[in-house]
Amino acid sequence: PAVPETAGGKPPPRGTASDMGRHKHIHVIRMKKQALVTGATSGIGRATALRLATEGYDVIATGRRSERLESLRREIEAAGGRCTTLTFDVRSEEAVRRNLEPLGRVDLLVNNAGLAAGLEHIDKGDTADWDAMIDTNVKGLLYVTRVITPKMVAAGGGHVFNIGSIAGTEPYENGAVYCASKHAVHAISQAMRADLLASGIKVTEIRPGMVETEFSEVRFHGDKERADRVYDGVEPLTGEDIAEAIAWAAQLPAHMTVNEMVLMPSQQAGAYYTHRKN
């Protein structure tokens, strides 16, 4: 059909009611937010991936145990969510880059991959345990952050959650290297916040106290009986508790940031202060 004319015999300018009427079926497509969670095979990471999926995020879950990641993916998708899994070890910079550089936009990063290994005096510690903790808790976090934050800068914003520990600010006996690794996470989070401030990227450090996960079993190299004694007489936090806190902080308005969250069981006041019921 002929283009309608206005007075003077000229077609109406683009953007008028006549022009817009021809495009009334155009829909604005809003892309879902993407969340990347490291160490998602168990504990805090798994719970966080599930929780963020319920908040409408498309989840990218990473870890070393492919069968557990596949189980997580099935659970998220059965509930109507979307999940992509990537199996690699954050201790390998090459693996981090190979798996994460091809990703597109990442709106939320949860640097959760971490571990404790061993619980001995410094003069008796196993240097292999020390390497595992530093390589995972510090270098792994840095490798992932180095790949993902440029994507956030390019997109004009994002939110990074670093999972630390009260051990990062309350060193305890037999935990020198683990405490040092989490102190590094604390310092990195503070500096990262300053580095990324002008880019509109939020940085939140989560410092939990006692959380019942595989943490203690890994620390004691599979000694479940010894691991279970850590929680004797105490109702610890769960991975779901930490995930709930992350989901809450993630949905705050753009002008508001939670810099740090210290989350404790109600029976724990600090690294050295726990009330155990008989």
What are these regions (language model features)?
Residues 67, 87-98, 127:
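The beta1-alpha1 cofactor-binding region of Rossmann-like NAD(H)/NADP(H)-dependent oxidoreductases
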Residues 57-71:
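Conserved glycine-rich Rossmann-like NAD(P)H-binding loop of the short-chain dehydrogenase/reductase
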Residues 120-122, 126-131:
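Substrate-binding pocket helix/loop in short-chain dehydrogenase/reductase
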Residues 41-42:
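Conserved glycine-rich cofactor-binding loop
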Residues 205-206, 213, 224-272:
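C-terminal helical subdomain
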Residues 145, 181:
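Active-site helix of classical SDR
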